[in-house]
């Protein structure tokens, strides 16, 4: 059976695992680098991106993930971690050829929900935006999947999927299922 890991350093790990299981696959909380060898794909959850990067450094995840050819899906802070560039600083894992701007929809009090049309998935996906980034620039090879108010909020490139919002905070698991069935199983 296909096994999907969720990096369990911070964020809504249980909620992501629930979406994996609702999609019909096994979800595993990844707490140790060695576990990366046991999975077919990895979800990088939201949270605080600076903290996430520090924890990934501390536990040795950065080096291993840069070396691995593993399909990855980043949500919110996970998107920032996958990006090659983050507004005036270099990226972290450098997997998606994009530039991300942090907190571009405002602070926590400015959080909102929006119905999204996500190319290839559905035209009625509920997006929960909490201190969300947006994708300011995409390079060649990156496919734009969705925008909100003219800002890019979902992209894919090869085996990498990135979204600005939190799909795991809704009951709609279609994005997770898409990641597994179109970017891992293909």
Swiss-Prot record:
Against CDD domains, the record matches this protein to: GATase1_PB
Which InterPro entries does the record match to this protein? Class_I_gatase-like, PdxT/SNO, PdxT/SNO_CS
GO cellular component terms, alphabetically, are: cytosol; glutaminase complex
What's its EC? 4.3.3.6, 3.5.1.2
UniProt keyword annotations, A-Z: Glutamine amidotransferase, Hydrolase, Lyase, Pyridoxal phosphate
One Pfam family, please name it. SNO
Q: Where does L-glutamine bind?
A: 47-49, 102, 130-131
One of its GO biological process terms is: pyridoxal phosphate biosynthetic process
**By its UniProt entry, which SUPFAM superfamilies does this protein fall under?**
Class I glutamine amidotransferase-like
Provide the catalytic activity annotation. aldehydo-D-ribose 5-phosphate + D-glyceraldehyde 3-phosphate + L-glutamine = pyridoxal 5'-phosphate + L-glutamate + phosphate + 3 H2O + H(+); L-glutamine + H2O = L-glutamate + NH4(+)
Q: In which pathway does it act?
A: Cofactor biosynthesis; pyridoxal 5'-phosphate biosynthesis
Q: Name one GO molecular function term.
A: pyridoxal 5'-phosphate synthase (glutamine hydrolysing) activity
Keyword match Kinase? no
Instruction: State the active site.
Output: 76 (nucleophile), 166 (charge relay system), 168 (charge relay system)
Cell cycle found in the keyword field = no
What role does it play?
Answer: Catalyzes the hydrolysis of glutamine to glutamate and ammonia as part of the biosynthesis of pyridoxal 5'-phosphate. The resulting ammonia molecule is channeled to the active site of PdxS.
Q: How does it assemble?
A: In the presence of PdxS, forms a dodecamer of heterodimers. Only shows activity in the heterodimer.
Q: Which family does it belong to?
A: Belongs to the glutaminase PdxT/SNO family.
PANTHER family linked to this entry: PYRIDOXAL 5'-PHOSPHATE SYNTHASE SUBUNIT SNO, PYRIDOXAL 5'-PHOSPHATE SYNTHASE SUBUNIT SNO1-RELATED
Name of the protein this chain belongs to: Pyridoxal 5'-phosphate synthase subunit PdxT
Query: Lineage of the native species?
Result: Bacteria, Bacillati, Bacillota, Bacilli, Bacillales
Question: What gene, per UniProt, encodes this protein?
Answer: pdxT
């Amino acid at each position: 059976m296909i096994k999907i890991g969720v990096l369990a350093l911070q964020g809504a790990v249980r909620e992501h695992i629930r979406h994996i299981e609702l999609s019909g696959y096994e979800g595993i909380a990844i707490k140790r680098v060695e576990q990366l060898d046991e999975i077919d794909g990895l979800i990088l959850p939201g949270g605080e991106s600076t903290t996430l990067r520090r924890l990934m450094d501390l536990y040795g995840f950065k080096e291993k993930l840069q070396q691995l050819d593993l399909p990855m899906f980043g949500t919110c802070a996970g998107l920032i971690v996958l990006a090659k560039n983050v507004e005036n600083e270099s990226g972290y894992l450098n997997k998606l050829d994009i530039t991300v701007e942090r907190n571009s929809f405002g602070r926590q009090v400015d959080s909102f929900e929006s119905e999204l049309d996500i190319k290839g998935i559905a035209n009625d996906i509920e997006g929960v935006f909490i201190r969300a980034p947006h994708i300011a620039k995409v390079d060649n090879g990156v496919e734009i999947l969705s925008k909100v108010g003219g800002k890019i909020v979902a992209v894919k490139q090869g085996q990498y999927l990135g979204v600005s919002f939190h799909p795991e905070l809704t009951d709609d698991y279609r994005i997770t299922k898409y990641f597994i069935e179109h970017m891992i199983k293909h």
